[in-house]
Amino acid sequence: MTISVALAMLQRDGRWLLQLRDDIDSIIYPGHWGLFGGHVEPGESPADAVQRELMEEISWAPSTPLQPWFSDDSGTRPAHVFRGALTAPLEQLCLKEGQDLKLASLEELCSETIWSDHCQEQRPIAPGLSIVMRRLLAEMDDA
């Protein structure tokens, strides 16, 4: 059975919420910036998985369900990407997974690395985030 992931592309004030993954060799893309989310458990829908993962990782639940945006199976695992508004200020989020979080600008998202205040250094963007950014930029060009 293929394990898929559900990811959240959350926007607040023209910036997008990112997670800096832990520096643990056993996880995919350690030390890279990516989106909050995670594995879809057996019998769980991707929509339920993204809600659960947000609660587990940042102790936050959206007031309205996130909207399915797109699915992609070109990476290491099939990904279901959801989008929505981050209605809580960054300071109200409680980071429980990962080593940093950040609201990144479009310019930062289009670069190869993003600064981590916690680590005090530039960290790379996960390849999966590049797929999401290409989709976002294509939609912005179409608008």
Task: Give the residues covered by each predicted segment.
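Conserved N-terminal beta-strand and adjoining loop/helix that marks the start
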Residues: M1-L18, F36
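Active-site segment of metal-dependent pyrophosphate-handling enzymes
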Residues: M55-L90
